[in-house]
UniProtKB/Swiss-Prot annotation:
Name of the protein in question: UPF0473 protein SPD_0182
Family that this chain belongs to: Belongs to the UPF0473 family.
PANTHER family noted in UniProt: UPF0473 PROTEIN CBO2561/CLC_2432, UPF0473 PROTEIN CBO2561_CLC_2432
Record-annotated membrane-spanning stretches: none
The organism of origin for this protein: Streptococcus pneumoniae serotype 2 (strain D39 / NCTC 7466)
Amino acid sequence: MSHDHNHDHEERELITLVDEQGNETLFEILLTIDGKEEFGKNYVLLVPVNAEEDEDGQVEIQAYSFIENEDGTEGELQPIPEDSEDEWNMIEEVFNSFMEE
């Protein structure tokens, strides 16, 4: 399993997501994970730009999968099935390693 991520927090990568009601929310790309070898797709972890920490000092992180387009651009973000334990375990393992660095 391999993963790529950017530790340079000065140069943030941002993405805008639009919900079902058309509301736009700006997110920072926290981490991208190369899961093509194991699962045939990549993953991205996002945190809202204006996220506030809860009483435990935590912020909500959202995870999505995506398959790169043939031209190398990112494809459409897809939710990760809740019952996909192997995918969630891999994401959690990579995220925990990222947070320890």
